[in-house]
Amino acid sequence: MDPTTSFPKDKIKILLLENIHIAAIKQFEEQGFQVESISSSLPEDKIIEKIKDVHVLGLRSKTKVTEKILSEAKRLLAIGCFCIGTDQVDLIEAEKRGVPVFNSPFCNSRSVAELIICEIITLSRKLGDRSTEMHNKIWRKESANCHEIRGKTLGIIGYGHIGSQLSVLAEAMGMSVLYYDIARRLPLGNSKMCPDMKTLLENSNFVTLHVPDTKETVGLIGEEEINTMKKGSYLLNASRGKVVQIPHLANALRSGHLAGAAVDVYPEEPSANCKDWECELQKCPNTILTPHIGGSTEEAQEAIGLEVSDLIVQFINSGASAGSVNFPEIALPVSPSTHRILNIHNNKPGVLRDINNILSEFNVSAQVLSTRKQIGYIIADVDSEASKEIKKKISSLPNSIKTRVLY
């Protein structure tokens, strides 16, 4: 069933930043939504200019959605993060304003894990340096300090969806796997959990990072941690740019303490492709530098585009909030011959009583409610004749944030 919405679909505006996959654009357009797609991220002032009449904002990892932006987004219904992380969005402020944030936590896990396997082999065989030499007309065939990865130990810091999938691939290549995570996680295959990060660093030939961007992970790998690693070992980071202290990594590579590194993320990254990017790690020996491409495969981006756009479409069309990272997750089957009312309110004592006092005056055919931290979210199906009056009464409640007649 596709009921007529109280707000015409062709009036709903979607703003997509950072080159969101065409699959998402098509999915939105098939719903009749207006879609504007921009290939790069935008600075705060430019987003504020555009967001005043935008209903859905889509982005990847570079765009920052701040309190200031959200305060200007008067019509914003939802935010879609077409990536794993959501730390680029002020989730608390979005929650306060009744704006759910959706993401895709699993779709690019395989792509990132495959990249790490590729880089482990490339580093172990010094393929990057050999390729550069050949392009510079230098033929150097040697086996010194080039090794198989079979029998080597991979240490994984962060054993979530990427880390655990990587452990399976690494074992299939003949590697032993150690892992460390602040949460106790069951091992896959023959991987072994370390009691602390120091133990992992001391016993790994390759150390790879798969942690979120939090206060605790900023500068997680610094001089002390790098010095704890085995001499001749390798460090790989495809998680977040601020996790590794770049100057100390560069020193360890130039001194020979580390035999190589692969870095895909950086403390500061350009908002779009450019030709003048600089980093201390440039010219370091046996060092792979890639421009944040861990999840940049056609397969991953298409899957992410479809998943996040589908979650947003479901929210706009039915109010279902499944998959939101900052919102109560509820859904209600569509009921014929009714109007659907959505209400987002402050999660305070007495609010539900006030809402139910209003609803009790009318014929309510179905209702569902859930709360999360600061807010509560209710979906109610009511007689069509009463929907406007109910909306007016609920909207006037002091703790009501948003009330919408969906259809």
UniProtKB/Swiss-Prot annotation:
Name a single GO cellular component.
phagocytic vesicle
Instruction: Give one GO biological process term.
Output: L-serine biosynthetic process
Q: Which Pfam families match?
A: 2-Hacid_dh, 2-Hacid_dh_C, ACT_AHAS_ss
Signal sequence: where? Answer: none
Q: Does the keyword NAD apply?
A: yes
In this chain, NAD(+) is annotated as bound at 161-162, 181, 238-240, 264, 292-295
Q: Which GO terms describe its molecular function?
A: NAD binding; phosphoglycerate dehydrogenase activity
Gene3D superfamilies from the UniProt entry = 3.30.70.260, NAD(P)-binding Rossmann-like Domain
Its domain of life? Eukaryota
**Where do the ACT domain residues begin and end?**
340-407
Q: Which InterPro entries match?
A: ACT-like_dom_sf, ACT_dom, AHAS_small-like_ACT, D-iso_2-hydroxyacid_DH_PdxB, D-isomer_2_OHA_DH_cat_dom, D-isomer_DH_CS, D-isomer_DH_CS1, D-isomer_DH_NAD-bd
What this protein catalyses is: (2R)-3-phosphoglycerate + NAD(+) = 3-phosphooxypyruvate + NADH + H(+); (R)-2-hydroxyglutarate + NAD(+) = 2-oxoglutarate + NADH + H(+)
| Similarity section | Belongs to the D-isomer specific 2-hydroxyacid dehydrogenase family.
Q: What does this protein do?
A: Catalyzes the reversible oxidation of 3-phospho-D-glycerate to 3-phosphonooxypyruvate, the first step of the phosphorylated L-serine biosynthesis pathway. Also catalyzes the reversible oxidation of 2-hydroxyglutarate to 2-oxoglutarate.
Q: Which NCBIfam families match?
A: PRK11790.1 (NF008759)
Q: Which PANTHER family match?
A: D-ISOMER SPECIFIC 2-HYDROXYACID DEHYDROGENASE CATALYTIC DOMAIN-CONTAINING PROTEIN-RELATED (PTHR43761:SF1), D-ISOMER SPECIFIC 2-HYDROXYACID DEHYDROGENASE FAMILY PROTEIN (AFU_ORTHOLOGUE AFUA_1G13630) (PTHR43761)
What is the name listed in the Swiss-Prot or TrEMBL entry for this protein? Answer: D-3-phosphoglycerate dehydrogenase
The species is: Dictyostelium discoideum
